[in-house]
Amino acid sequence: MAEQKIISLFDDDACTRYTILIASTIGEMREKKESIIDNTDPEIVKYLSQLLDVFRENFDTWAMAVVNRTGCALDPSTPKDQVEVKKFRQFSETEKSECFIKCLLLLILSLGNYSPYSRNLLYSIAEKLGLSSIVVYKAELITSSMLLDTFQTMESNQEMYELSGTRKMRRRIAMGLAGLAGGALIGLTGGLAAPFVAAGLGTLFAGLGLGTMIGATYLGTLITSAPMITALFGGFGAKMSMQQMGDVSKGLTDFEFIPLSVQSHLPVTIGISGWLGDYNEVDAAWKSLTVGDKSYYWGDIYALKFEVEALVDLGKSLSRILFSAGLGWVKGEVISRTILAPLAAALWPLSLLKVGNILGNSWRIAFNLSIKAGEALANALCVRAQGMRPVTLIGFSLGARTILECLLHLADRGETNLVENVIVMGAPMPTDAKLWLKMRCVVAGRFVNVYSASDYVLQLVYRVNSAQSTAAGLGPVSLDSNTLENVDVGDLVEGHLQYRWLVAKILKERLGYDNISDAEIQSLAVQEEKYESKQRTYYSQKEQEEEIEQEVLFDASSDTELAIQKKEDEVNEVRENKK
């Protein structure tokens, strides 16, 4: 096909070298997955045999599509544009590699999707070519901007608006679903897209002096196909911004993706909090990902909002355990019984169990809802709310549990090529290797378990409310490091609530994501100090008020009216100061 004979830039040697590089890298990706299986207990492999077969089938289908597409494009027998080939030969090796990576990105996108496997392939090849990951980040950014600009330009064209003249489509535009409507417009006027795409490619290959229309053909029919563009970006964010998520979130009173930084980038990141300090803090823990000149690495960033009332109630209960002076003894009691003398929760002192039960009610409610949210998240990903783009999931506390439940549901459905990276912190999840391997089968990239043995709050609530003795958020999961990264943050986290302010610090300093802003990490540390100070003051006043009220009740049994009045005045004074 003419559209497949698209690269007239590389000479024969380069075509052969790059073809081999693509094939060998894909082979290594498959071998890496297979090695996870080879190093696993045979009983577990037997348990996961059906899922592993699905993974192999999905991977091989993807690999064949990529090999066929790039193989045709890099066929040495394809006629070459000698002017462009001459330019290419004058490039340095770094420039040649950079040019190839950008062409490979366009070729992959021409398949109509940008899957986690595809993104892993791109970054792996870039690393082999000695390129910084920043080259790929910027190529993704420029390419997505190019497609978005094309989309918006056509959508604003009056002639195209008239073509969308049905009442239904105009009503959609009025409702704010311009992403869906605009997708239809592209289909009606696809031929007008090429000039705008060419301009974008000029930016992508800036400084290399290449003909932009050669690059334009790399995208194949993507530049003129409404279904492909709309599917790739999920209606340019329209699907993820819709509040009507009833079909995927049955059993939940609220379930919504809150956009933090959404500019139709190629990757998608979703942050999920496991408790909230207030009703308006759904996105607070994830704003740090949007700060800095490298924040585009995360792509389109969303915070998942679900069952806010339950998560706020849980946050209040956790704060009471951590910051109430009257419960200061809990920390030492839990640690001594966990580290010095590990015991089942049933053998713990009654006083400690009572504290656990105080927290337990709000925990159990939120815990059960987080499991439902995990299924709803899996539903949303399966219907491609994110489009055909790779997704990174990051969560702490019950947000981590939501993510892990989502992975289990994806595994049950055989969806092995939706999620790129997963990072869970303080996860209240059993350390059963069988479960974690099952989840690993649906994570294409990094899978990270961040834990703290010093997290005495999680120790308390998990032991009281679970039959399991150990949570993944308290210690490592016994799997090979190539399968799962276990990261110890015991020197940073001891109170569970701290994950809320330490997400950015952990991502940068412990997991190597250098796109996080140092200034933002420092700002979060200050915010944490202010929050803790405010909470301690609040519970100190609350305890003082409760203590005085108890004294009033005690003195009321005497006949000393003056003493009673004095105590009542003290209570009123405390209440007034609190206001």
Swiss-Prot record:
GO MF annotation terms: lipase activity
Lipid bilayer topology: Multi-pass membrane protein
GO cellular component term of the entry, any: nuclear membrane
Membrane-spanning residues: 173-193, 196-216, 218-238
UniProt keyword terms in alphabetical order: Cytoplasm, Membrane, Nucleus, Transmembrane, Transmembrane helix
Record-level GO BP terms: vesicle-mediated transport
Record localization: Cytoplasm; Nucleus membrane
InterPro entries given in the database record: AB_hydrolase_fold, DUF726
Top-level lineage group: Eukaryota
Pfam families: DUF726
Protein family per UniProt: Belongs to the TMCO4 family.
Name by which UniProt lists this protein: Uncharacterized membrane protein C6F6.13c
